Protein backbone atom coordinates (compact mmCIF):
# COMPACT_ATOMS: atom_id res chain seq x y z
CA UNK A 1 0.00 0.00 0.00
CA UNK A 2 1.38 3.41 -0.97
CA UNK A 3 2.37 5.88 1.76
CA UNK A 4 -0.02 8.77 2.40
CA UNK A 5 0.52 12.49 2.89
CA UNK A 6 -1.84 13.94 5.54
CA UNK A 7 -2.54 17.64 6.12
CA UNK A 8 -4.56 19.00 9.04
CA UNK A 9 -6.85 21.96 9.85
CA UNK A 10 -5.49 25.31 8.63
CA UNK A 11 -2.82 23.80 6.37
CA UNK A 12 -5.38 21.49 4.67
CA UNK A 13 -7.99 24.24 4.29
CA UNK A 14 -5.53 26.74 2.80
CA UNK A 15 -4.33 24.28 0.14
CA UNK A 16 -7.91 23.27 -0.73
CA UNK A 17 -8.96 26.95 -0.94
CA UNK A 18 -6.09 27.64 -3.34
CA UNK A 19 -7.43 24.94 -5.69
CA UNK A 20 -10.97 26.32 -5.39
CA UNK A 21 -9.70 29.80 -6.33
CA UNK A 22 -7.73 28.58 -9.36
CA UNK A 23 -10.74 26.78 -10.86
CA UNK A 24 -13.28 29.48 -9.96
CA UNK A 25 -11.09 32.29 -11.34
CA UNK A 26 -10.82 30.46 -14.69
CA UNK A 27 -14.58 29.78 -14.85
CA UNK A 28 -15.99 33.11 -13.64
CA UNK A 29 -14.50 35.17 -16.49
CA UNK A 30 -17.18 33.57 -18.73
CA UNK A 31 -20.14 34.92 -16.69
CA UNK A 32 -22.65 37.34 -18.21
CA UNK A 33 -23.26 38.81 -21.66
CA UNK A 34 -19.80 40.40 -21.71
CA UNK A 35 -18.02 37.39 -20.24
CA UNK A 36 -14.74 36.43 -21.93
CA UNK A 37 -13.78 33.24 -23.74
CA UNK A 38 -11.46 30.56 -22.39
CA UNK A 39 -9.11 28.71 -24.78
CA UNK A 40 -8.59 25.04 -23.91
CA UNK A 41 -5.63 23.16 -25.34
CA UNK A 42 -6.45 19.71 -26.70
CA UNK A 43 -3.98 16.82 -26.95
CA UNK A 44 -5.15 16.35 -30.55
CA UNK A 45 -6.80 18.75 -32.99
CA UNK A 46 -7.32 22.49 -32.70
CA UNK A 47 -7.69 24.22 -29.31
CA UNK A 48 -11.28 24.65 -28.14
CA UNK A 49 -12.70 28.10 -27.47
CA UNK A 50 -15.65 28.20 -25.10
CA UNK A 51 -17.76 30.40 -22.85
CA UNK A 52 -19.41 27.40 -21.21
CA UNK A 53 -18.49 27.24 -17.52
CA UNK A 54 -18.80 23.49 -17.07
CA UNK A 55 -16.60 22.80 -20.14
CA UNK A 56 -13.83 24.92 -18.57
CA UNK A 57 -14.27 23.30 -15.14
CA UNK A 58 -14.05 19.77 -16.58
CA UNK A 59 -10.67 20.49 -18.19
CA UNK A 60 -8.90 21.66 -15.02
CA UNK A 61 -6.64 19.22 -13.20
CA UNK A 62 -3.94 20.57 -10.85
CA UNK A 63 -0.49 19.14 -10.11
CA UNK A 64 -0.64 19.63 -6.32
CA UNK A 65 -2.84 16.82 -4.92
CA UNK A 66 -4.41 18.96 -2.16
CA UNK A 67 -5.12 21.93 -4.41
CA UNK A 68 -6.59 19.49 -6.90
CA UNK A 69 -9.03 18.23 -4.22
CA UNK A 70 -10.45 21.74 -3.91
CA UNK A 71 -10.65 22.16 -7.69
CA UNK A 72 -12.38 18.77 -8.14
CA UNK A 73 -14.95 19.53 -5.42
CA UNK A 74 -15.77 22.79 -7.17
CA UNK A 75 -15.95 20.96 -10.49
CA UNK A 76 -18.58 18.76 -8.83
CA UNK A 77 -20.67 21.90 -8.16
CA UNK A 78 -20.60 22.82 -11.87
CA UNK A 79 -21.40 19.25 -12.95
CA UNK A 80 -24.30 18.91 -10.50
CA UNK A 81 -25.83 22.22 -11.63
CA UNK A 82 -25.39 21.10 -15.23
CA UNK A 83 -27.05 17.71 -14.59
CA UNK A 84 -30.04 19.14 -12.74
CA UNK A 85 -30.82 22.32 -14.67
CA UNK A 86 -28.44 22.16 -17.65
CA UNK A 87 -27.27 25.71 -17.06
CA UNK A 88 -26.13 28.02 -14.24
CA UNK A 89 -22.79 26.25 -13.90
CA UNK A 90 -20.74 29.46 -13.77
CA UNK A 91 -23.16 31.06 -11.28
CA UNK A 92 -22.89 27.96 -9.06
CA UNK A 93 -19.07 28.10 -9.22
CA UNK A 94 -18.97 31.82 -8.32
CA UNK A 95 -21.36 31.25 -5.39
CA UNK A 96 -19.39 28.25 -4.11
CA UNK A 97 -16.11 30.19 -4.20
CA UNK A 98 -17.65 33.08 -2.24
CA UNK A 99 -19.15 30.75 0.41
CA UNK A 100 -15.92 28.73 0.80
CA UNK A 101 -13.73 31.87 1.09
CA UNK A 102 -15.87 33.53 3.77
CA UNK A 103 -16.50 30.24 5.56
CA UNK A 104 -12.81 29.39 5.81
CA UNK A 105 -12.02 32.88 7.12
CA UNK A 106 -14.60 32.35 9.87
CA UNK A 107 -13.25 28.88 10.74
CA UNK A 108 -9.71 30.35 10.92
CA UNK A 109 -11.08 32.98 13.33
CA UNK A 110 -12.17 30.18 15.68
CA UNK A 111 -15.85 29.69 14.79
CA UNK A 112 -17.51 26.28 14.88
CA UNK A 113 -17.66 24.88 11.31
CA UNK A 114 -20.78 22.78 12.00
CA UNK A 115 -22.72 25.79 13.28
CA UNK A 116 -21.56 27.83 10.28
CA UNK A 117 -22.92 25.09 8.00
CA UNK A 118 -26.25 25.06 9.87
CA UNK A 119 -26.52 28.83 9.41
CA UNK A 120 -25.68 28.49 5.69
CA UNK A 121 -28.38 25.81 5.23
CA UNK A 122 -30.93 27.95 7.10
CA UNK A 123 -30.23 30.95 4.86
CA UNK A 124 -30.32 28.89 1.63
CA UNK A 125 -33.76 27.51 2.55
CA UNK A 126 -35.02 31.07 3.11
CA UNK A 127 -33.57 32.34 -0.20
CA UNK A 128 -35.09 29.40 -2.14
CA UNK A 129 -38.52 30.17 -0.63
CA UNK A 130 -38.11 33.81 -1.67
CA UNK A 131 -37.11 32.85 -5.25
CA UNK A 132 -40.12 30.55 -5.60
CA UNK A 133 -42.44 33.27 -4.29
CA UNK A 134 -41.13 35.79 -6.87
CA UNK A 135 -41.08 33.33 -9.79
CA UNK A 136 -43.60 33.86 -12.61
CA UNK A 137 -44.68 31.15 -15.10
CA UNK A 138 -43.48 31.34 -18.71
CA UNK A 139 -46.18 32.61 -21.05
CA UNK A 140 -45.84 32.33 -24.80
CA UNK A 141 -43.02 31.48 -27.15
CA UNK A 142 -41.50 34.99 -27.00
CA UNK A 143 -40.52 34.45 -23.34
CA UNK A 144 -39.19 30.97 -24.16
CA UNK A 145 -37.10 32.53 -26.95
CA UNK A 146 -35.85 35.21 -24.54
CA UNK A 147 -34.65 32.61 -22.01
CA UNK A 148 -32.81 30.81 -24.83
CA UNK A 149 -31.21 34.04 -26.08
CA UNK A 150 -29.90 34.92 -22.59
CA UNK A 151 -28.53 31.41 -22.01
CA UNK A 152 -26.87 31.36 -25.45
CA UNK A 153 -25.03 34.61 -24.63
CA UNK A 154 -27.28 36.87 -26.68
CA UNK A 155 -27.53 34.68 -29.81
CA UNK A 156 -31.01 35.62 -31.07
CA UNK A 157 -31.13 32.87 -33.70
CA UNK A 158 -30.59 30.16 -31.07
CA UNK A 159 -33.43 31.43 -28.87
CA UNK A 160 -35.84 31.70 -31.77
CA UNK A 161 -35.05 28.21 -33.11
CA UNK A 162 -35.59 26.65 -29.66
CA UNK A 163 -38.91 28.49 -29.21
CA UNK A 164 -40.00 27.33 -32.68
CA UNK A 165 -39.01 23.73 -31.89
CA UNK A 166 -40.93 23.80 -28.59
CA UNK A 167 -43.98 25.22 -30.35
CA UNK A 168 -43.92 22.38 -32.88
CA UNK A 169 -43.30 19.37 -30.63
CA UNK A 170 -44.80 20.70 -27.40
CA UNK A 171 -43.11 21.19 -24.05
CA UNK A 172 -42.82 17.41 -23.52
CA UNK A 173 -41.36 16.77 -26.99
CA UNK A 174 -37.82 15.57 -27.62
CA UNK A 175 -35.48 18.26 -28.97
CA UNK A 176 -32.02 17.05 -29.99
CA UNK A 177 -29.01 19.07 -31.13
CA UNK A 178 -26.71 17.92 -33.94
CA UNK A 179 -23.89 19.43 -35.99
CA UNK A 180 -24.98 20.59 -39.47
CA UNK A 181 -22.94 20.26 -42.64
CA UNK A 182 -23.44 23.87 -43.83
CA UNK A 183 -23.33 27.36 -42.32
CA UNK A 184 -27.02 27.69 -41.47
CA UNK A 185 -29.13 26.74 -38.48
CA UNK A 186 -31.76 24.18 -39.49
CA UNK A 187 -34.79 22.79 -37.69
CA UNK A 188 -36.21 19.38 -38.66
CA UNK A 189 -39.43 18.25 -37.03
CA UNK A 190 -40.47 14.60 -37.06
CA UNK A 191 -44.19 14.17 -36.52
CA UNK A 192 -45.53 11.11 -34.73
CA UNK A 193 -43.47 8.40 -33.11
CA UNK A 194 -39.96 7.63 -34.29
CA UNK A 195 -37.72 4.80 -33.11
CA UNK A 196 -34.19 3.88 -34.14
CA UNK A 197 -34.74 0.71 -36.16
CA UNK A 198 -34.57 0.60 -39.97
CA UNK A 199 -35.86 -1.88 -42.56
CA UNK A 200 -34.56 -5.45 -42.29
CA UNK A 201 -34.07 -5.82 -46.04
CA UNK A 202 -33.55 -3.23 -48.80
CA UNK A 203 -36.03 -5.27 -50.89
CA UNK A 204 -38.84 -3.68 -48.86
CA UNK A 205 -38.01 -0.22 -50.31
CA UNK A 206 -40.91 1.43 -52.15
CA UNK A 207 -39.17 4.70 -53.04
CA UNK A 208 -35.77 3.84 -54.62
CA UNK A 209 -34.90 7.53 -55.16
CA UNK A 210 -34.95 8.34 -51.45
CA UNK A 211 -34.11 4.76 -50.40
CA UNK A 212 -37.10 4.60 -48.05
CA UNK A 213 -40.18 2.48 -47.44
CA UNK A 214 -43.47 4.42 -47.51
CA UNK A 215 -46.65 2.67 -46.38
CA UNK A 216 -50.00 4.48 -46.58
CA UNK A 217 -52.81 3.41 -44.24
CA UNK A 218 -50.98 0.24 -43.11
CA UNK A 219 -51.92 -2.42 -40.61
CA UNK A 220 -49.24 -2.89 -37.93
CA UNK A 221 -48.49 -6.30 -36.40
CA UNK A 222 -46.68 -5.94 -33.04
CA UNK A 223 -45.05 -9.22 -31.96
CA UNK A 224 -42.69 -9.53 -28.98
CA UNK A 225 -40.82 -12.72 -29.98
CA UNK A 226 -38.63 -13.75 -32.93
CA UNK A 227 -40.22 -14.88 -36.20
CA UNK A 228 -38.33 -17.70 -37.91
CA UNK A 229 -41.12 -19.12 -40.07
CA UNK A 230 -44.46 -17.76 -41.20
CA UNK A 231 -46.57 -20.92 -40.88
CA UNK A 232 -48.47 -19.62 -37.84
CA UNK A 233 -48.95 -16.22 -39.51
CA UNK A 234 -50.63 -17.44 -42.71
CA UNK A 235 -54.25 -16.74 -41.60
CA UNK A 236 -53.52 -13.09 -40.75
CA UNK A 237 -51.35 -12.57 -43.87
CA UNK A 238 -54.23 -13.81 -46.07
CA UNK A 239 -56.66 -11.47 -44.29
CA UNK A 240 -54.30 -8.50 -44.90
CA UNK A 241 -53.90 -9.40 -48.61
CA UNK A 242 -57.70 -9.48 -49.00
CA UNK A 243 -58.03 -6.06 -47.32
CA UNK A 244 -55.67 -4.61 -49.97
CA UNK A 245 -53.76 -2.59 -47.35
CA UNK A 246 -50.00 -2.75 -46.62
CA UNK A 247 -48.59 -4.43 -43.50
CA UNK A 248 -45.75 -3.42 -41.15
CA UNK A 249 -44.36 -6.17 -38.93
CA UNK A 250 -42.53 -5.11 -35.74
CA UNK A 251 -40.92 -8.10 -33.98
CA UNK A 252 -37.88 -8.88 -31.81
CA UNK A 253 -36.25 -10.26 -34.97
CA UNK A 254 -37.28 -11.80 -38.28
CA UNK A 255 -34.85 -14.46 -39.41
CA UNK A 256 -34.00 -16.74 -42.31
CA UNK A 257 -37.04 -18.39 -43.85
CA UNK A 258 -39.56 -15.86 -42.50
CA UNK A 259 -37.65 -12.88 -43.92
CA UNK A 260 -37.04 -14.64 -47.25
CA UNK A 261 -40.77 -15.48 -47.58
CA UNK A 262 -41.78 -11.88 -46.88
CA UNK A 263 -39.25 -10.54 -49.42
CA UNK A 264 -40.44 -12.97 -52.14
CA UNK A 265 -44.08 -12.02 -51.51
CA UNK A 266 -43.18 -8.35 -51.60
CA UNK A 267 -41.29 -8.70 -54.92
CA UNK A 268 -44.10 -10.69 -56.54
CA UNK A 269 -46.47 -7.91 -55.53
CA UNK A 270 -48.90 -10.15 -53.68
CA UNK A 271 -48.29 -8.56 -50.28
CA UNK A 272 -47.20 -4.95 -49.61
CA UNK A 273 -45.11 -5.60 -46.53
CA UNK A 274 -42.15 -4.25 -44.55
CA UNK A 275 -40.49 -5.58 -41.41
CA UNK A 276 -38.43 -3.90 -38.68
CA UNK A 277 -36.90 -5.02 -35.40
CA UNK A 278 -38.55 -3.88 -32.18
CA UNK A 279 -36.82 -0.92 -30.45
CA UNK A 280 -35.05 -1.20 -27.10
CA UNK A 281 -33.90 -4.24 -25.10
CA UNK A 282 -35.35 -6.47 -22.38
CA UNK A 283 -38.16 -5.00 -20.30
CA UNK A 284 -37.78 -1.64 -22.03
CA UNK A 285 -38.54 -3.33 -25.38
CA UNK A 286 -41.83 -4.71 -24.01
CA UNK A 287 -42.78 -1.28 -22.68
CA UNK A 288 -42.00 0.40 -26.02
CA UNK A 289 -44.00 -2.20 -27.97
CA UNK A 290 -46.90 -1.54 -25.61
CA UNK A 291 -46.50 2.22 -26.32
CA UNK A 292 -46.70 1.53 -30.08
CA UNK A 293 -49.76 -0.70 -29.53
CA UNK A 294 -51.57 2.06 -27.60
CA UNK A 295 -50.57 4.71 -30.16
CA UNK A 296 -51.90 2.63 -33.08
CA UNK A 297 -54.90 1.03 -31.29
CA UNK A 298 -53.46 -2.44 -31.75
CA UNK A 299 -52.54 -5.26 -29.39
CA UNK A 300 -49.08 -6.49 -28.51
CA UNK A 301 -49.11 -10.14 -29.57
CA UNK A 302 -47.50 -11.91 -26.64
CA UNK A 303 -47.70 -15.56 -25.67
CA UNK A 304 -47.36 -14.42 -22.03
CA UNK A 305 -50.80 -12.86 -22.46
CA UNK A 306 -52.15 -16.06 -24.03
CA UNK A 307 -52.39 -14.66 -27.58
CA UNK A 308 -50.97 -16.94 -30.29
CA UNK A 309 -50.03 -15.79 -33.78
CA UNK A 310 -52.43 -18.22 -35.48
CA UNK A 311 -55.37 -16.68 -33.58
CA UNK A 312 -54.61 -13.05 -34.53
CA UNK A 313 -57.41 -11.18 -36.34
CA UNK A 314 -57.40 -7.88 -38.24
CA UNK A 315 -58.91 -5.95 -35.32
CA UNK A 316 -55.88 -6.89 -33.17
CA UNK A 317 -53.54 -5.08 -35.57
CA UNK A 318 -52.55 -1.44 -35.09
CA UNK A 319 -53.31 1.18 -37.73
CA UNK A 320 -51.75 4.50 -38.79
CA UNK A 321 -52.15 7.05 -41.58
CA UNK A 322 -48.56 6.70 -42.72
CA UNK A 323 -45.35 4.85 -41.91
CA UNK A 324 -41.92 5.86 -43.24
CA UNK A 325 -38.85 3.64 -42.81
CA UNK A 326 -35.27 4.43 -43.80
CA UNK A 327 -32.17 2.35 -43.09
CA UNK A 328 -31.89 3.70 -39.52
CA UNK A 329 -35.33 4.90 -38.36
CA UNK A 330 -39.02 4.05 -38.45
CA UNK A 331 -41.62 6.83 -38.11
CA UNK A 332 -45.29 6.15 -37.41
CA UNK A 333 -47.45 9.19 -38.21
CA UNK A 334 -51.01 9.72 -36.99
CA UNK A 335 -51.65 6.40 -35.21
CA UNK A 336 -55.29 5.40 -34.77
CA UNK A 337 -54.93 5.21 -30.97
CA UNK A 338 -57.64 6.34 -28.58
CA UNK A 339 -56.82 9.80 -27.11
CA UNK A 340 -57.88 8.75 -23.59
CA UNK A 341 -55.75 5.58 -23.69
CA UNK A 342 -52.71 7.57 -24.89
CA UNK A 343 -53.28 10.16 -22.14
CA UNK A 344 -53.48 7.38 -19.54
CA UNK A 345 -50.21 5.89 -20.79
CA UNK A 346 -48.53 9.34 -20.71
CA UNK A 347 -49.62 9.81 -17.06
CA UNK A 348 -48.29 6.35 -16.20
CA UNK A 349 -44.85 7.18 -17.70
CA UNK A 350 -44.84 10.55 -15.89
CA UNK A 351 -45.43 8.75 -12.59
CA UNK A 352 -42.47 6.43 -13.35
CA UNK A 353 -40.26 9.46 -14.10
CA UNK A 354 -41.13 10.91 -10.66
CA UNK A 355 -40.24 7.70 -8.80
CA UNK A 356 -37.11 6.50 -10.66
CA UNK A 357 -33.73 7.11 -9.04
CA UNK A 358 -31.59 6.31 -12.09
CA UNK A 359 -30.64 9.19 -14.42
CA UNK A 360 -30.36 6.77 -17.35
CA UNK A 361 -33.85 5.34 -16.73
CA UNK A 362 -35.27 8.84 -16.34
CA UNK A 363 -33.77 9.90 -19.68
CA UNK A 364 -35.19 6.82 -21.45
CA UNK A 365 -38.63 7.36 -19.86
CA UNK A 366 -38.62 11.00 -20.98
CA UNK A 367 -37.83 9.86 -24.53
CA UNK A 368 -40.79 7.46 -24.42
CA UNK A 369 -43.01 10.20 -23.02
CA UNK A 370 -42.02 12.60 -25.78
CA UNK A 371 -42.64 10.03 -28.50
CA UNK A 372 -46.17 9.51 -27.21
CA UNK A 373 -47.01 13.09 -26.27
CA UNK A 374 -45.46 15.22 -28.99
CA UNK A 375 -42.83 14.51 -31.57
CA UNK A 376 -39.13 14.92 -32.15
CA UNK A 377 -37.36 18.11 -33.28
CA UNK A 378 -33.73 18.18 -34.41
CA UNK A 379 -31.83 21.50 -34.30
CA UNK A 380 -28.84 21.35 -36.66
CA UNK A 381 -26.11 23.83 -35.74
CA UNK A 382 -24.01 25.26 -38.57
CA UNK A 383 -20.84 27.35 -38.69
CA UNK A 384 -17.83 28.30 -40.81
CA UNK A 385 -15.27 26.16 -38.95
CA UNK A 386 -15.37 23.05 -36.78
CA UNK A 387 -14.30 25.08 -33.72
CA UNK A 388 -17.18 27.53 -34.26
CA UNK A 389 -19.74 24.73 -34.73
CA UNK A 390 -18.65 23.00 -31.50
CA UNK A 391 -18.77 26.28 -29.53
CA UNK A 392 -22.24 27.12 -30.89
CA UNK A 393 -23.48 23.59 -30.18
CA UNK A 394 -22.40 24.01 -26.52
CA UNK A 395 -24.43 27.22 -26.34
CA UNK A 396 -27.48 25.64 -27.98
CA UNK A 397 -27.34 22.75 -25.47
CA UNK A 398 -27.20 25.23 -22.58
CA UNK A 399 -30.04 27.30 -24.00
CA UNK A 400 -32.18 24.21 -24.53
CA UNK A 401 -31.74 23.09 -20.93
CA UNK A 402 -32.44 26.61 -19.67
CA UNK A 403 -35.71 26.88 -21.61
CA UNK A 404 -36.85 23.48 -20.31
CA UNK A 405 -36.04 24.64 -16.76
CA UNK A 406 -38.01 27.87 -17.35
CA UNK A 407 -41.06 25.94 -18.51
CA UNK A 408 -40.77 23.70 -15.43
CA UNK A 409 -40.47 26.23 -12.58
CA UNK A 410 -40.98 29.69 -14.13
CA UNK A 411 -38.67 32.68 -14.45
CA UNK A 412 -37.16 35.48 -12.34
CA UNK A 413 -35.37 38.71 -13.41
CA UNK A 414 -31.89 37.80 -14.70
CA UNK A 415 -28.43 39.31 -14.45
CA UNK A 416 -27.93 38.16 -10.84
CA UNK A 417 -30.65 40.52 -9.54
CA UNK A 418 -32.97 37.74 -8.28
CA UNK A 419 -30.28 36.60 -5.82
CA UNK A 420 -29.26 40.18 -4.96
CA UNK A 421 -32.80 41.09 -3.87
CA UNK A 422 -33.09 37.82 -1.94
CA UNK A 423 -30.76 39.47 0.61
CA UNK A 424 -33.90 41.31 1.83
CA UNK A 425 -35.49 37.96 2.72
CA UNK A 426 -32.55 37.36 5.08
CA UNK A 427 -33.02 40.63 7.00
CA UNK A 428 -33.76 39.91 10.64
CA UNK A 429 -33.02 36.17 10.25
CA UNK A 430 -30.97 34.94 13.21
CA UNK A 431 -29.48 31.56 14.05
CA UNK A 432 -29.55 29.72 17.38
CA UNK A 433 -26.11 31.20 18.21
CA UNK A 434 -23.57 33.72 16.87
CA UNK A 435 -21.80 31.15 14.68
CA UNK A 436 -25.06 30.21 12.93
CA UNK A 437 -25.87 33.89 12.42
CA UNK A 438 -22.41 34.27 10.85
CA UNK A 439 -23.35 31.41 8.45
CA UNK A 440 -26.46 33.40 7.43
CA UNK A 441 -24.24 36.48 6.84
CA UNK A 442 -21.94 34.39 4.61
CA UNK A 443 -24.90 33.58 2.31
CA UNK A 444 -26.12 37.20 2.42
CA UNK A 445 -22.71 38.31 1.15
CA UNK A 446 -22.28 35.40 -1.32
CA UNK A 447 -25.57 35.90 -3.19
CA UNK A 448 -24.39 39.36 -4.27
CA UNK A 449 -21.34 37.89 -6.06
CA UNK A 450 -22.96 36.74 -9.34
CA UNK A 451 -24.25 40.27 -10.06
CA UNK A 452 -20.92 41.81 -9.02
CA UNK A 453 -19.04 39.40 -11.32
CA UNK A 454 -21.37 40.07 -14.29
CA UNK A 455 -20.82 43.83 -13.79
CA UNK A 456 -17.04 43.38 -13.41
CA UNK A 457 -16.85 41.31 -16.63
CA UNK A 458 -18.68 44.18 -18.38
CA UNK A 459 -16.06 46.66 -17.12
CA UNK A 460 -17.98 48.15 -14.15
CA UNK A 461 -17.38 48.19 -10.40
CA UNK A 462 -19.54 45.35 -9.06
CA UNK A 463 -19.86 46.82 -5.55
CA UNK A 464 -21.13 50.16 -6.93
CA UNK A 465 -23.71 48.45 -9.20
CA UNK A 466 -24.98 46.25 -6.34
CA UNK A 467 -25.17 49.27 -4.01
CA UNK A 468 -27.13 51.33 -6.56
CA UNK A 469 -29.73 48.57 -7.03
CA UNK A 470 -30.19 47.91 -3.32
CA UNK A 471 -30.71 51.65 -2.75
CA UNK A 472 -33.46 51.79 -5.41
CA UNK A 473 -35.14 48.73 -3.88
CA UNK A 474 -37.42 47.94 -6.87
CA UNK A 475 -37.14 44.15 -7.34
CA UNK A 476 -37.94 44.39 -11.08
CA UNK A 477 -35.04 46.83 -11.67
CA UNK A 478 -31.64 45.49 -12.53
CA UNK A 479 -28.41 46.18 -14.37
CA UNK A 480 -28.44 45.12 -18.02
CA UNK A 481 -24.74 44.36 -18.63
CA UNK A 482 -25.30 43.94 -22.38
CA UNK A 483 -26.40 47.59 -22.77
CA UNK A 484 -24.87 49.09 -19.56
CA UNK A 485 -28.32 50.39 -18.51
CA UNK A 486 -30.32 50.17 -15.28
CA UNK A 487 -33.84 49.08 -16.31
CA UNK A 488 -36.77 46.71 -15.75
CA UNK A 489 -35.06 43.44 -16.67
CA UNK A 490 -38.20 41.39 -17.33
CA UNK A 491 -39.44 44.02 -19.77
CA UNK A 492 -35.99 44.08 -21.42
CA UNK A 493 -36.07 40.28 -21.78
CA UNK A 494 -33.21 39.62 -19.34
CA UNK A 495 -34.65 36.63 -17.48
CA UNK A 496 -33.34 33.49 -15.79
CA UNK A 497 -35.16 30.21 -15.14
CA UNK A 498 -35.96 29.94 -11.41
CA UNK A 499 -34.78 26.31 -11.41
CA UNK A 500 -31.32 27.32 -12.71
CA UNK A 501 -30.84 30.00 -10.01
CA UNK A 502 -32.22 27.70 -7.28
CA UNK A 503 -30.05 24.68 -8.14
CA UNK A 504 -26.95 26.87 -8.56
CA UNK A 505 -27.34 28.14 -4.98
CA UNK A 506 -28.29 24.78 -3.43
CA UNK A 507 -25.43 22.87 -5.10
CA UNK A 508 -22.90 25.61 -4.29
CA UNK A 509 -23.94 25.68 -0.61
CA UNK A 510 -23.92 21.88 -0.38
CA UNK A 511 -20.33 21.42 -1.61
CA UNK A 512 -19.05 24.60 0.09
CA UNK A 513 -20.50 23.34 3.39
CA UNK A 514 -18.51 20.11 3.04
CA UNK A 515 -15.28 22.01 2.32
CA UNK A 516 -15.75 24.39 5.28
CA UNK A 517 -16.21 21.44 7.67
CA UNK A 518 -13.06 19.66 6.40
CA UNK A 519 -10.49 19.15 9.15
CA UNK A 520 -8.00 16.80 7.45
CA UNK A 521 -6.98 15.89 3.91
CA UNK A 522 -5.28 12.64 2.85
CA UNK A 523 -3.40 12.12 -0.40
CA UNK A 524 -1.07 9.50 -1.83
CA UNK A 525 2.63 10.33 -1.79
CA UNK A 526 4.32 9.98 -5.18
CA UNK A 527 6.44 6.84 -5.33
CA UNK A 528 10.19 7.24 -5.82
CA UNK A 529 10.82 5.00 -8.79
CA UNK A 530 14.44 3.79 -9.04
CA UNK A 531 16.30 4.98 -12.12
CA UNK A 532 16.56 2.49 -14.97
CA UNK A 533 19.99 0.78 -15.05
CA UNK A 534 22.26 1.88 -17.86
CA UNK A 535 22.25 -0.71 -20.66
CA UNK A 536 25.53 -1.89 -22.18
CA UNK A 537 26.10 -1.05 -25.82
CA UNK A 538 25.31 -3.54 -28.57
CA UNK A 539 23.17 -6.67 -28.27
CA UNK A 540 23.70 -8.68 -25.12
CA UNK A 541 24.72 -12.30 -25.54
CA UNK A 542 26.22 -11.78 -28.96
CA UNK A 543 29.82 -11.47 -27.80
CA UNK A 544 32.45 -13.89 -28.96
CA UNK A 545 30.89 -14.50 -32.32
CA UNK A 546 33.51 -14.06 -34.97
CA UNK A 547 32.19 -12.89 -38.31
Curated annotation (Swiss-Prot):
The record's note on quaternary structure and interaction partners says: Forms a cylinder of 14 subunits composed of two heptameric rings stacked back-to-back. Interacts with the co-chaperonin GroES.
Q: Where in the cell is it found?
A: Cytoplasm
GO BP annotations of the record are: protein refolding
Positions bound to ATP: 30-33, 51, 87-91, 415, 480-482, 496
Q: List the disulfide bonds.
A: none
Keyword terms, alphabetized: ATP-binding, Chaperone, Cytoplasm, Isomerase, Nucleotide-binding
SUPFAM superfamilies reported in the protein's UniProt record: GroEL apical domain-like (SSF52029), GroEL equatorial domain-like (SSF48592), GroEL-intermediate domain like (SSF54849)
**UniProt record similarity statement:** Belongs to the chaperonin (HSP60) family.
As recorded in UniProt, its EC number(s) are 5.6.1.7
Instruction: State the protein's name.
Output: Chaperonin GroEL 1
Gly residues: which segments have biased composition? 535-547
Query: Which purpose does this protein serve, as stated in its record?
Result: Together with its co-chaperonin GroES, plays an essential role in assisting protein folding. The GroEL-GroES system forms a nano-cage that allows encapsulation of the non-native substrate proteins and provides a physical environment optimized to promote and accelerate protein folding.
Q: Name one GO molecular function term.
A: unfolded protein binding
Q: Which PROSITE patterns match?
A: CHAPERONINS_CPN60
> What's the catalysed reaction?
ATP + H2O + a folded polypeptide = ADP + phosphate + an unfolded polypeptide
Gene name, please?
groEL1
Amino acid sequence: MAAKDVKFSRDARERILKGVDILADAVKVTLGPKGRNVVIDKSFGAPRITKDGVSVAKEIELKDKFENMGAQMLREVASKANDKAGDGTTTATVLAQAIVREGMKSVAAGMNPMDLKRGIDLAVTKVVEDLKARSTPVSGSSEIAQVGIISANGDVEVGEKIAEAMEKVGKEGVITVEEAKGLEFELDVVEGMQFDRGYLSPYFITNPEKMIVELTDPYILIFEKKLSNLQSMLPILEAVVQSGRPLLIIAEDIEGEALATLVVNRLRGGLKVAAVKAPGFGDRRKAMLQDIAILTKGEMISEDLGIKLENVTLNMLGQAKRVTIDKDNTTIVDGAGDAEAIKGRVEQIRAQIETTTSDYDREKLQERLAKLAGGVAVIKVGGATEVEVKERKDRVDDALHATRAAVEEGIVPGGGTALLYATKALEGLKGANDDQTRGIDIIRKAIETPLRQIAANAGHDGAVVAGNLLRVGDVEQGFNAATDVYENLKAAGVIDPTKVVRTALQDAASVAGLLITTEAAVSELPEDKPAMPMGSGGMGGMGGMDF
